[in-house]
């Protein structure tokens, strides 16, 4: 079995492709089950699997079964999402072994994010791991890998300043609006969505002077809670057309699988604004729409409407590109931390080479102990239960003490890349089948 990763991100695939391969929360159970189980009697692709799907990446982490190839994973993606492989295969990257660990640790640390050092990715990595754990697709290898990657993310944020003042996608979206429109005071701002992205956007909008904020979400309770925290107006989702009609800025970040705003919605909103101005010959009103969702919330052809400016997460590069330069001084330290965590994982992986021999050694020792204990007890008569327990405890203690040193030595040798050599020697010395 081998550690394997297939994925695409904001550096290899535009949002038009990322949204086609994104996995929703409702998709994950089915996808993970398909990857790790088989109804045909043939081995599944993965013995273990985790899917990380965010607005900027879709990545499949797995421990492959013998015979699994990259093409098998491509075929799975094509079949699951009902997309021709030719439409996305050129955007995929594939890693194996050590490179998988390095990629995940760097990802959890925010070093592969569109916004360098952003903190949200660590929670997204944790959520992906926990979702797979609930499904039962996480085994010992991915458990260890994701725990070490999360430590890498935590260490980078605590031991470097790379995350100090780091923008989030939400903050970048607000900054884009500020750059395009200037002062946000008096602007009608519509937030669509009730999750973390919307909450961060609300925080940053208020910090940048926005004072006329409306929140719309399918779940009214979440929208109401956000509105109360940030002094915003809350509207039911059914009032979205009316909210659009008065909005100057729209920031949308729902988890909807298809767009929730189409061209006719925005065209009607612009027409309403035009009528309200009572100026038929004036330039069309402007509306700034920032779509932070993947899959996208706003249909692409909305951008064709005069006066409408539509931006997606891919357009945020112009806002955040400077963060790489600003944080390059601490980037090297962060990469060193990532490498330390990678080496810790690799050391643990090497110790796994020793487990089969150690298991056989322990089993052989138990066989001998049980045989000799039974022989001794047959020769001793009239022992009380307490006396028998003492003798049995003595036999266990002797075995444990005798095995402690070779066990420790083999584990240490394995951690330093000598596991196979020492395991072979131990197997020969104790006549173990290896």
Swiss-Prot record:
Marked site positions, Important for activity: 103
Gene Ontology biological process terms, A to Z: chlorophyll biosynthetic process; protoporphyrinogen IX biosynthetic process from glutamate
Metabolic or biological pathway: Porphyrin-containing compound metabolism; protoporphyrin-IX biosynthesis; 5-aminolevulinate from L-glutamyl-tRNA(Glu): step 1/2; Porphyrin-containing compound metabolism; chlorophyll biosynthesis
Alphabetized InterPro entries for the sequence: 4pyrrol_synth_GluRdtase (IPR000343), 4pyrrol_synth_GluRdtase_dimer (IPR015896), 4pyrrol_synth_GluRdtase_N (IPR015895), GluRdtase_dimer_dom_sf (IPR036453), GluRdtase_N_sf (IPR036343), NAD(P)-bd_dom_sf (IPR036291), Shikm_DH/Glu-tRNA_Rdtase (IPR006151)
Superkingdom of origin: Bacteria
Residues given in the record as substrate binding sites: 54-57, 113, 118-120, 124
Signal peptide per UniProt: none
Enzyme class: oxidoreductase
GO MF entries: glutamyl-tRNA reductase activity; NADP binding
Assigned EC number: 1.2.1.70
Entry annotation: catalytic residues: 55 (nucleophile)
Keywords, sorted A to Z: Chlorophyll biosynthesis, NADP, Oxidoreductase, Porphyrin biosynthesis
Extra information: During catalysis, the active site Cys acts as a nucleophile attacking the alpha-carbonyl group of tRNA-bound glutamate with the formation of a thioester intermediate between enzyme and glutamate, and the concomitant release of tRNA(Glu). The thioester intermediate is finally reduced by direct hydride transfer from NADPH, to form the product GSA.
Family that this chain belongs to: Belongs to the glutamyl-tRNA reductase family.
Its biological purpose: Catalyzes the NADPH-dependent reduction of glutamyl-tRNA(Glu) to glutamate 1-semialdehyde (GSA).
Protein name per UniProt: Glutamyl-tRNA reductase
């Amino acid at each position: 079995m081998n550690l394997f990763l297939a994925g695409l991100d904001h550096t290899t695939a535009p949002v038009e492709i990322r949204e086609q391969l994104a996995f929703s929360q409702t998709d994950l159970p089915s996808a993970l089950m398909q990857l790790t189980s088989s109804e045909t009697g043939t081995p599944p692709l993965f013995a273990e699997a985790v899917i990380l799907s965010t607005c900027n990446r879709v990545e499949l982490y797995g421990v492959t079964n013998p015979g699994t190839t990259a093409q098998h994973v491509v075929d799975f993606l094509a079949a699951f999402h009902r997309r021709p492989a030719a439409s996305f295969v050129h955007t995929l990257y594939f890693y194996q072994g050590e490179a998988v660990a390095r990629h995940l640790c760097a990802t959890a640390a925010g070093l592969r994010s569109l916004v360098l050092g952003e903190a949200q990715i660590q929670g997204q990595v944790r959520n992906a791991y926990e979702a797979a754990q609930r499904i039962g697709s996480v085994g010992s290898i991915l458990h260890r890998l994701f725990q070490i990657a999360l430590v890498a993310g935590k260490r980078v944020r605590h031991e470097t300043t790379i995350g100090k003042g780091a923008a989030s996608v939400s903050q970048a979206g607000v900054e884009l609006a500020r750059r395009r429109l200037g002062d946000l005071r008096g602007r009608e701002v519509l937030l669509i969505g009730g999750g973390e992205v919307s909450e961060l956007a609300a925080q940053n909008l208020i910090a940048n002077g926005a004072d006329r904020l409306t929140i719309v979400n399918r779940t009214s309770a979440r929208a109401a809670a956000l509105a109360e925290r940030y002094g915003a107006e809350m509207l039911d989702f059914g009032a979205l057309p009316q909210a659009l009609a008065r909005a100057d800025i729209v920031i949308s970040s729902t988890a909807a699988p298809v767009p929730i705003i189409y061209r006719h919605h925005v065209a009607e909103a612009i027409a309403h604004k035009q009528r309200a101005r009572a100026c038929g010959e004036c330039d069309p009103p402007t509306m700034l729409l920032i779509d932070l969702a993947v899959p996208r919330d706003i249909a692409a052809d909305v951008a064709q409407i005069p006066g409408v400016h539509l931006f997606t997460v891919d357009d945020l590069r112009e806002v955040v590109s400077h963060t790489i330069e600003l944080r390059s001084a601490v980037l090297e330290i962060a990469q060193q931390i990532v490498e330390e965590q990678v080496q810790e994982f690799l050391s643990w992986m090497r110790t796994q080479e020793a487990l089969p021999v150690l298991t056989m050694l322990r089993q052989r020792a138990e066989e001998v102990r049980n045989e000799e204990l039974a022989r001794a007890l047959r020769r001793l008569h009239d022992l009380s239960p307490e006396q028998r327990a003492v003798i049995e405890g003595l036999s266990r203690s002797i075995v444990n003490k005798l095995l402690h040193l070779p066990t420790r030595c083999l584990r240490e040798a394995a951690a330093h890349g000598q596991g196979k050599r020492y395991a072979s020697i131990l197997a020969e010395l104790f006549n173990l089948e290896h």
